[in-house]
Amino acid sequence: MSSKEFTNISSQIIKDSFSLWLNQHTEEGQTIAEICIANAQARQKSNKKVDRKKIISGPALPGKLTDCTTDDPEQGELFLVEGESAGGSAKRARDRNFQAILPLKGKIMNTWEVDVSEVLASQEVNNIAIALGVEPGSNNLDGLRYGKVCILADADSDGLHIATLLCALFLRHFRPLVEAGRVYVSMPPLYRIDQGKDVHYALDDPEKDKLVKELQKKNKRTKIEVQRFKGLGEMNASQLRETTMLPGARRLVQLTVKNGDKSSQMVDMLLSKKRSQDRKEWLEDKGNLANV
């Protein structure tokens, strides 16, 4: 039955009989043809999607990158997470279907005045570039592997410093990503506020104070407990998911640049080594506005 001779004979018999049947049953034949075409198109589309993981030629993806499973780059989100401890929590909190995690070790270098030809000397910057599929200084975003890039750092002053350095990196060396609206800053809470069984979160001190007053006004009998997170690593996976990573519940601030705005001038004043005097004067003038 499985011999070559029998296969040739049976194939010819089936082909002739099936061709005759198709000629006599045109509607059914049309349906079968449409199914075959749809399946072929699905296979072709699937083959194209697989290329998402192979967009980058050359270096392999960073070993610390925990990638998502979606084959659609537009749906993917890359979280650049401060610290390996927080990176572990983020991996457990993420939706593996479309959220990828790249933990960053320590404080990223100040790249504001670093030439584009030298910026990849930083291992962390190199990992970011490879994970993104975009080279620093390039206007070509065809290889971009994610629709959103989310900076996720601690909510305290140290975390804000790291987030500022990452924003500077994108403004200086990945500006087309910013102009395309691809870069976001995640806003994790600094406080957890419990009143009975109710749980609330606050981004900063002003929001915490306002929320505590509102809760006291509504219910004076139930004790209010306030917990300050020391860092992202102190949050468990469920807390990180519901406050920072879950679409619809999280807060993201889009990093934007517009013609005529002063974003670059402000970052230059904050990070340029040559402008220490300008920084000193700015701190003397604006330092009272800081919440410390």
Regions from the language model: what does each represent?
Residues 75-76, 147-149, 174, 227-229:
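A generic hydrophobic-helix recognition signal that picks specific residues
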Residues 69-94, 156-165, 230-245:
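Conserved phosphate/anionic-ligand binding catalytic regions in large, soluble enzymes, centered on
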Residues 37, 66, 70, 85, ...:
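Signal for well-folded cores of large energy- and translation-related assemblies
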Residues 7, 11, 58, 77, ...:
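Active-site-proximal structural scaffolding
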Residues 1-107, 139-141, 148, 252-292:
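GHKL-family ATPase ATP-binding module
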Residues 8, 12-20, 34, 130, ...:
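A broad, structural surface signal
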Residues 43, 53, 62, 157, ...:
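Charged C-terminal transducer/switch regions of large nucleotide-driven machines
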Residues 85-87, 92-198:
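Conserved structured catalytic cores and adjacent interaction surfaces
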